[in-house]
């Protein structure tokens, strides 16, 4: 630290004033300039009062990925079919599956999506409408496993979203914003039979049997050699779907997008028709409120379809209601920890577009460059003046310790001593020693008169 006094910094008030002045000199000007420049040169943000109101919104617990409902196909009365076929050398076998789709229809019974394995294996997964309720049936080598949502009818012509996940023999199903239904096979009967059978198995064969059962159990939880994904269910003896399907997602595949882009592994048959010219087409449903659950739902008709329009940076953006965005959550429909995480290649996270606020003015930005500059200059000048005052006070305090003392020589009370200008006494040689010797000699003399 820089020493201002040769004998060290004074204590007490001077030390405190020194610290305050140094801190003001170092920090006050930069902080003043930084706060003035933080809002931009010559701009003051003046927010206006925005009236608040309640807006009902239905949000999904699953993360949103895309900014629109996805590619939409309409299936007419004559029936249509979209088939995706895996290449022969690229047929997956999965332990966990994810399926999600948005749709609207008035049919009580129809097949929406079906995934089949190679011929001879018998594994399959089917999403269907049965008696107006959503139902999923799958078989991965044991028996048919069913999971169904019976608390809500989906054949009302409104827009609905279905999310299904499978992990081994366990499954979950969710329709719109209803609670998730879980299905966990108990398997107690098989465990009891296995315990009885182990008692009759010879000890030397126990290890071989355990290995076989373990391998068999693994096979009974895997959807082996998947070959096709069929959308629409238009086949001989099947229940064709009539209505619209949007944003279908299955294990990282967006089959409707691939069909719209002309993928060679996808073929379109029958009366299936793409809505719009681009895969980014979306559905604009009409919002309605259900009386039972008091939830925000959507009721689109098949003809109420529009395409997403691009907007520039300063213009208005055409957005869709928030219920459309729930279809995009098909890419990650569940947060179950037992299921593998979402494929990062399926898309990045994105914020859902918010509906445009109408009738409320936007905050104004008022430019006042001259007043802002004057304020900054005034603050800096005041800080400099404070520093100068503190330095002057410290200077006066320092000079008080080095004052001089004046001596009036006319009133010299000590005749044999002298003083310096600063008051210190000066030592002189004693003159009384030779005088004493002279007096001693005078004592020996006698005078006679």
UniProtKB/Swiss-Prot annotation:
Subcellular location, principal: membrane
Q: Where does this protein have coiled-coil stretches?
A: none
Q: Which organism is it from?
A: Danio rerio
Q: What does this protein do?
A: Neuronal cell surface protein that may be involved in cell recognition and cell adhesion. May play a role in formation or maintenance of synaptic junctions.
Membrane protein topology class: Single-pass type I membrane protein
Locations of Low complexity compositional bias?
280-311
Per UniProt, what is one Pfam family of this protein? Syndecan
Which ranges does the record list as Cytoplasmic topological domains? 395-449
Location in the cell reads: Membrane
Q: Provide ranges: composition bias, Polar residues.
A: 312-322
GO terms under cellular component: membrane
Q: Where is this region: Disordered?
A: 276-366, 415-449
Q: Which residues lie on this side of the membrane: Extracellular?
A: 39-373
- Similarity-based family: Belongs to the neurexin family.
Supply the name of the protein. Answer: Neurexin-1a-beta
Laminin G-like domain location: 71-272
Which GO annotations describe the biological process of this protein? cell adhesion; sprouting angiogenesis
Which gene does this sequence derive from?
nrxn1a
- Which SUPFAM superfamilies did the record assign? Concanavalin A-like lectins/glucanases
For this protein, the parts annotated as crossing the membrane are 374-394
Carries keyword Zinc? Answer: no
């Amino acid at each position: 630290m820089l020493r201002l006094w040769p004998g060290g910094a004074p204590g007490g008030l001077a030390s405190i004033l020194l610290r305050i002045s140094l801190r003001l000199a170092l920090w006050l000007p930069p902080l003043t300039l930084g706060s003035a420049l933080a809002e931009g040169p010559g701009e003051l943000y003046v927010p206006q009062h925005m009236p608040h109101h309640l807006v009902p919104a239905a949000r999904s617990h699953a993360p949103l990925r895309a900014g629109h409902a996805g590619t939409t196909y309409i299936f007419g009365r004559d029936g249509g079919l979209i088939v995706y076929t895996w290449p022969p050398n690229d047929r997956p076998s999965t332990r966990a599956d994810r399926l999600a789709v948005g749709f609207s229809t008035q049919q009580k019974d129809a097949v929406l999506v079906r995934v089949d394995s190679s011929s001879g294996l018998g594994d399959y997964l089917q999403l269907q409408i049965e008696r107006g309720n959503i139902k999923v049936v799958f078989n991965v080598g044991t028996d048919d496993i069913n999971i169904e949502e019976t608390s809500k009818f989906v054949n009302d012509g409104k827009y609905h979203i279905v999310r299904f996940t499978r992990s081994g023999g366990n499954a979950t199903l969710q329709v719109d914003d209803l609670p998730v239904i879980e299905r966990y096979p108990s398997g107690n009967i098989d465990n009891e039979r296995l315990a009885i059978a182990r008692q009759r198995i010879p000890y030397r064969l126990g290890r071989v049997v355990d290995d076989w059962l373990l391998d068999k159990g693994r096979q009974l939880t895997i959807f082996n050699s998947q070959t096709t994904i069929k959308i629409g269910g238009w086949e001989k003896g099947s229940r064709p779907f009539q209505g619209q399907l949007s944003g279908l997602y299955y294990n990282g595949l967006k089959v409707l997008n691939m069909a719209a882009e002309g993928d060679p592994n996808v073929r379109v048959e029958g009366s299936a028709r793409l809505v719009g010219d681009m895969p980014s087409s979306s559905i604009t449903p009409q919002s309605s409120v259900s009386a039972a659950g008091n939830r925000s739902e959507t009721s689109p008709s098949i003809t109420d379809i529009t395409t997403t329009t691009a907007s520039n940076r300063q213009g208005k953006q055409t957005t869709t209601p928030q219920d459309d965005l729930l279809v995009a959550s098909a890419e990650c429909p569940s947060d179950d920890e037992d299921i593998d995480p979402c494929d990062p290649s399926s898309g990045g996270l994105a914020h859902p577009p918010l509906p445009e606020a109408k009738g409320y003015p936007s905050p104004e930005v008022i430019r006042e460059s001259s007043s802002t500059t004057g304020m900054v200059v005034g603050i800096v000048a005041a800080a400099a003046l404070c520093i100068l005052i503190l330095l002057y006070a410290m200077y006066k305090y320092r000079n008080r310790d080095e004052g001089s003392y004046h001596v009036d020589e006319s009133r010299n009370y000590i005749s044999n001593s002298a003083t310096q200008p600063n008051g210190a006494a000066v030592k002189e040689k004693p003159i009384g020693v030779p005088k004493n010797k002279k007096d001693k000699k005078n004592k020996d003399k006698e005078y006679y008169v």
